[in-house]
């Protein structure tokens, strides 16, 4: 008899995929021994003749179901018109600790923008009663201590996910446009008796996009001060995909300009800003602290190595099982595990969400949906200077060999 781990190596699939096959009864003679399974030595890997065509999924999938949110990052729309995987307990985990400034680093297409928009909708005070978008979600079951924060803060929200240009001039113009749009969301400040004429003059500069580069670099700091004065409540600042323009600067030769701007931009917003309730940033990379976060001692970094928030970006095994059940294709679980169950965030095994929703939406045809969803210039540069030892380890990984790395992470 062999273990699931031994069979996984022989069949070249994940241990969880083998376990799932055992649970579903697809491996004749497999028996459970305590918490593990024992598999006959002569067992062969179950074959699904429908894998290549996806015909089973197309015929068997229930059609009277909400569509999956491919490319949808609007929380209100996602949770009302599409199949939504409830990630609202991220709010509880945050409120239990209340770090002043949080940075979440995750791979691209892992739901960062959708989660940040969820935070915006939850916390932002508006004329609309936005509690209706959370009353059937997990966060609402957590009690009044958490509900008391709903709709109680002014919010500044920016996403840099589309700031992808070949020059510094085009980049700064796009950032100026984003600030113009965000200031436009807060035009109530222009009629506020608590805002000085000087501040309103600056506000109109940003609104008309006539401010210079230096003035623009302090726009977050100044807007947070005006919102705090008007509402008697310091705002929450959310910056999504903060590192996108920095990556572009690295690959397009304007790195010094973007780093210099971002250092002042973020320093004014997050460093010793008394007009800040909380701050959230998301990105793919951890840019060196001395580059743009110099002196920002209140920054809490949450990477793929950390247990905190490990289940809120990407799909967990339970969430994938529920999704497959909803669409009536539970038989596809082992195949989906084999293809897309490839991440360990903290202590949580995580599926690539972009691949999962595309796989189900496109008739359960397995393929590399995540390929070519972003740029890899930085990785390419790292590989060019990689040592022979690193190259050897990479070859081992490509051959399915498990390797051990000892490393330290620095900001």
Task: Locate predicted features.
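Short, well-ordered beta-strand micro-motif
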Residues: 38-40, 159
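Phosphate-binding site recognition
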Residues: 61-411
């Amino acid at each position: 008899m062999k273990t699931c781990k031994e069979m996984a190596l022989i069949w070249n699939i994940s241990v969880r995929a083998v376990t799932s096959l055992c649970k579903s009864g697809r491996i004749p003679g497999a028996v459970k021994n305590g918490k593990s399974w024992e598999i006959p030595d002569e067992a062969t890997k179950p074959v699904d003749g429908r894998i290549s065509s996806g015909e089973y999924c197309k015929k068997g999938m229930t059609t009277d179901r909400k569509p999956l949110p491919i490319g949808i990052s609007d929380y209100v729309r996602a949770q009302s018109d599409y199949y939504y995987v409830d990630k609202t307990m991220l709010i509880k985990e945050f409120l239990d600790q209340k770090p002043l400034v949080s940075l979440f680093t995750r791979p691209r297409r892992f739901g960062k923008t959708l989660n940040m928009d969820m935070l915006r909708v939850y916390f932002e005070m508006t004329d609309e009663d936005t509690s209706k978008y959370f009353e059937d979600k997990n966060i609402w079951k957590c009690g009044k201590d958490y509900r008391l924060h709903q709709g109680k803060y002014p919010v500044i929200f920016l996403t840099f996910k589309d700031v992808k240009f070949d020059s510094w001039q085009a980049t700064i113009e796009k950032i100026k446009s984003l600030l113009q749009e965000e200031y436009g969301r807060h035009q109530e400040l222009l009629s506020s008796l608590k805002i000085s004429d000087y501040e309103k003059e600056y506000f109109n500069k940003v609104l008309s996009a006539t401010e210079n580069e230096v003035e623009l670099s302090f726009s977050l700091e100044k807007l947070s001060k005006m919102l705090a004065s008007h509402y008697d409540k310091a705002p929450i600042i959310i910056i999504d995909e903060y590192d996108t323009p920095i990556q572009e600067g690295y690959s397009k030769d304007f790195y010094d300009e973007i780093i210099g701007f971002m250092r002042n931009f973020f320093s004014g917003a997050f460093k010793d800003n008394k007009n800040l309730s909380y701050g959230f940033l998301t990105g793919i990379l951890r840019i060196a602290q001395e580059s743009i976060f110099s002196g920002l001692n209140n920054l809490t970094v949450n990477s793929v190595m950390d247990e905190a928030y490990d289940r809120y970006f990407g799909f967990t095994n339970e969430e994938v099982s529920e999704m497959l059940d909803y669409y009536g294709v539970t038989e596809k679980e082992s195949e989906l595990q084999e293809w897309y169950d490839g991440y360990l965030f903290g202590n949580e095994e995580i599926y690539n969400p972009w691949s999962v929703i595309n796989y189900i939406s496109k008739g359960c045809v397995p393929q590399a949906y995540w390929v070519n969803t972003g740029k890899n210039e930085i990785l390419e540069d790292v590989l060019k200077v990689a040592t022979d030892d690193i190259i050897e380890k990479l070859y081992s990984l490509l051959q399915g060999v498990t390797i051990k790395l000892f490393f330290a992470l620095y900001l």
